[in-house]
From Swiss-Prot:
Pfam families per UniProt: DAO, Methyltransf_30
Gene Ontology CC terms: cytoplasm
Catalytic activity: 5-aminomethyl-2-thiouridine(34) in tRNA + S-adenosyl-L-methionine = 5-methylaminomethyl-2-thiouridine(34) in tRNA + S-adenosyl-L-homocysteine + H(+)
Domain of life per record: Bacteria
Broad class of where this protein is predominantly found: cytoplasm
Descriptive protein name: tRNA 5-methylaminomethyl-2-thiouridine biosynthesis bifunctional protein MnmC
Family, similarity comment: In the N-terminal section; belongs to the methyltransferase superfamily. tRNA (mnm(5)s(2)U34)-methyltransferase family.
Entry's Gene Ontology molecular function annotations: flavin adenine dinucleotide binding; oxidoreductase activity, acting on the CH-NH group of donors; tRNA (5-methylaminomethyl-2-thiouridylate)(34)-methyltransferase activity
Source organism: Nitrosospira multiformis (strain ATCC 25196 / NCIMB 11849 / C 71)
Stretch list, region tRNA (mnm(5)s(2)U34)-methyltransferase: 1-226
Keyword Aminoacyl-tRNA synthetase tagged: no
Length: 617
């Protein structure tokens, strides 16, 4: 659907070019940056505030890159930029790279974008740049689905192809969604001066005027939504409770927005489920395009981009060995069959038969399924450490929280150290990222969290099993050998909080191997037939907090009190985007997820009955 004509990228689908024949970069700067008075608005930003831009039509990303460059050049420190864009037909890596190569002056910015581009997923993508000061939320979906799902825009770039060639982007309904997603005082600019656009924006509530266009275009439109811009006061201090992946990610997201963060952990860093020797990046997608599907997919893409920043792929701390999700049962075959019909890029996943699955894995497998080439494993404790690199974060271990008390300025946290000495901290906001034990606190007692014990098993590799190159998932998971041992798991025991290793659960983990591979069946039989071998197997137990429906509890529970709880076995992929959601909500910034997903994650909607906590002076 794309072609190059006279050095310009041309869409055969819409019969239009992606950028001006005169100068694509200069046109973007004139129409969108000058048209929205961005230089003046960036320079006048107050500390600890963010400016948000919405765009209809990401295209080559040129508008985003020149906006990012301008913001970094002139915006005061301790300010940030949110850029939201919609693109139904994204360019592939080669097309995007070739297009951006036309502007070498944007090379460093384009290189950063290309690194994230290889991690894009259908639906919503959230990527951070410039040390977290610039955030891009890219919705790869139809504009009619994306626009109703966001809000809080300060300036709009109304791009896309011309109204005559792409009328679906310029309807009255689109303009009403744009107005509804805008803050008071929001502006817009667009290269077109078409009457249908002017009248539609006016009907949506914008004040519209014509000004001189760029190059051969005689006129363009700009305007604003009447009303004074809102005053936004972001918090400056935060306490995060819980030193696992969810807590460390929350601390990192808040610190990147300029908050001073104190992180409390009752044991040592990553001592709970985040302390497993390796963790699996498992993106189990539901077949229906529901909130859970959209959340897991967005989480997966965000997690891969975040890991690229934090953890090297070195085979010790992280491996991008890929994951095979096998059609081992009728139910899984139906789920995988529905997903396989989606026309998605192969770098996200692709269907494979048993023969190709076996070739990818390096051992014979009994089933085909879905191949996720970007998945793999990592060492969760190392990710915890990497997330706490900011000097704005102070870690306190051995601190057990006893109470949370609201105050007129935020929250007071009472804790005990390992010597049972009382300890107290105060901050404007508190983020709770612990396990099921959080229900001992009155403010969180009504959340639907259930303890679930999980046991994983570590099995010495054999000559045959050593050939396994990928993660294999059936009713459980089986990892390639790491330091001479495979990890297999995990059991699920609801309302069981014991932490001792159980031989019967080792046997249960091994039994899952029989169904997916002759090689693993032999390995399972060799170990399972000798009780002494079972008793000598190493492993690890952890207790997670589980919630009904598999959606974690993420968001604001009470004024200034936030949660990121119940991530379950998907925590390695869902904790990062959840941290972004909490931080963006607390700071009044553009949200990284669709509003329907945000509502599905809300702890308020699932706390029952109403939480009896009153704000004290």
């Amino acid at each position: 659907m794309l072609d190059w004509q006279n050095g310009q990228l041309y869409s055969t689908r819409f019969g239009d070019v992606y950028f001006s024949r005169d100068s694509g970069l200069e046109e973007k700067q004139y129409v969108f940056l000058q048209g929205n008075r961005l230089a003046d608005r960036f320079e006048s930003l107050q500390p600890d505030t963010a400016f948000s831009i919405g765009e209809t039509g990401f295209g080559t990303g040129l508008s985003f890159l020149c906006t990012w460059r301008l913001f970094i050049q002139i915006a005061p420190l301790r300010t940030s930029l949110d850029f939201f864009s919609v693109e139904k037909y994204p360019l592939d890596e080669k097309e995007l790279s070739a297009a951006l190569a036309l502007w070498p002056e944007l090379g460093p910015y384009a290189d950063e974008l290309m690194l994230r581009w290889q991690r894009r997923v259908p639906g919503w993508n959230r990527w951070s740049f410039a040390g977290g000061r610039v955030r891009l939320t890219l919705a790869i979906e139809d504009v009619t689905r994306a626009l109703p799902e966001t809000h809080g825009i300060d300036a709009w770039f109304l791009d896309g192809f011309s109204p005559a060639r792409n009328p679906e982007m310029w309807t009255l309904q689109i303009f009403h969604w744009i107005a509804r997603a805008s803050r008071a005082g929001a502006t817009f600019a667009t290269y077109t001066s078409a009457g249908v656009v002017r009248r539609g924006l006016e009907q949506a509530g914008f004040q519209v005027k014509k000004i001189s266009g760029f190059g051969h275009k005689r006129e363009m439109l700009q305007g604003d939504l009447p009303g004074p811009p809102p005053v936004r006061l972001a918090p400056t201090t935060a306490i995060v409770i819980g030193g696992g992946i969810a807590g460390c990610a929350a601390a990192s997201a808040l610190a990147s927005r300029g908050l001073i963060v104190e992180l409390l952990e009752s044991h040592t860093l990553g001592a709970g489920a985040s302390g497993n020797p390796i963790g699996i990046l498992h993106a189990r997608l539901s077949a229906g395009m529901n909130a859970l599907h959209r959340f897991v997919l967005a989480s997966y893409g965000h997690a891969l981009a975040l890991l690229d920043e934090k953890i090297p792929v070195d085979g010790v701390m992280r491996s991008e060995c890929g994951e095979l999700q096998l059609s081992f049962s009728a139910e899984e075959a139906r789920r995988i069959g529905k997903l396989a019909t989606l026309d998605w890029p192969a770098h996200v996943f692709r269907p494979v038969d048993a023969a190709e699955a076996s070739a990818l894995a390096g051992i014979e497998l009994s089933y085909g399924g879905l191949w996720f080439p970007g998945s793999g494993w990592l060492a969760p404790p190392q990710l915890c450490v990497a997330l706490l690199g900011s000097q704005a974060i102070t870690l306190y271990t051995g601190r057990t929280v006893k109470s949370l008390t609201p105050t007129s300025h935020g929250w007071r946290v009472q804790a005990e150290d390992q010597r049972k000495q009382a300890w107290s901290l105060e901050a404007e906001i508190v983020v709770v990222c612990t396990g099921y034990q959080v229900k001992s606190l009155p403010a969180l007692a009504n959340l639907p969290l259930t303890p679930v014990r999980g046991q994983l098993t570590l099995i010495p590799a054999t000559t045959a099993s050593q050939n396994l190159r990928t993660i294999v998932c059936g009713s459980g998971y089986f990892s390639p050998a790491v330091a001479g041992r495979h990890m297999v798991g995990a059991t699920h025991r609801f309302n069981d909080t014991s932490i001792n290793l159980n031989v019967s659960e080792h046997a249960e983990n091994l039994s899952r191997l029989r169904e997916i591979s002759p090689v693993l069946r032999r390995l399972s039989d060799e170990v399972s037939q000798d009780i002494r071998q079972l008793e000598q197997l190493d492993g690890r137990t952890s207790i997670r907090g589980s919630v009904p429906g598999a959606m974690p509890l993420v968001g604001e529970l009470l004024p200034g009190l936030y949660t990121s709880l119940g991530h379950g076995t998907r925590g390695l992929i869902t904790a990062g985007i959840s941290a972004e959601l909490v931080a963006a909500t607390a700071c009044g910034q553009l949200l990284p997820l669709p509003l329907s997903v945000v509502n599905a994650l809300s702890p308020v909607r699932r706390a029952s009955p109403a939480i009896p906590v009153s704000i004290k002076g």
